[in-house]
Amino acid sequence: RVSRGLGDVYKRQAAYEAYISEDDVPHSIYECEGARTCAIELRSFSKNAGFTGMRLGFTVIPKELMCDGVALNPLWARRHGTKYNGAPYIIQRAGEAVYTPQGQAELKAQIDYYMNNAKMILTGLKSAGYSVSGGVNAPYIWLKTPDGMTSWQFFDYLLENVNIVG
């Protein structure tokens, strides 16, 4: 509502959408009321399908999205058609495979594996007495560094004393 009232355009990166496990968390910005008039969603295969480095994704710009009275969708289509020749064919085919039943099953297994690792790390760090959060809807864990250490000091501590790159 704030974006629409101010005329702002909100960009949402949805690379981790496949990791969302909570029922009350939207999988797309467009599940939010009014978002089609003020939001652009960026989707990537890098996080859900392990396509990091292959550069395959897509941008959703609703036809309802206007900026200063100008529809952004046709401007983006024109810009994209002029400046970008498309992903290599083999990468497009890999992206297509993501949507097959086998691809979906493999994605689910990979995501489950990453989320299970996050859960083990979270549990282990909590049991070691650290203040941690995360591991829900994304495979990342946030840790409060102990004793006022900076992140670099803690990185060095882990590397030198525990042989972990953290």
Where are these regions (language model features)?
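Conserved core segment of the aminotransferase class I/II
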Residues: E31-D112, K119-T123
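Short, conserved active-site loop motifs that form the nucleotide-linked donor/cofactor pocket
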Residues: A39, Y130, I164
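Conserved catalytic-core motifs of eukaryotic protein kinase domains, centered on the activation segment
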Residues: S21-D23
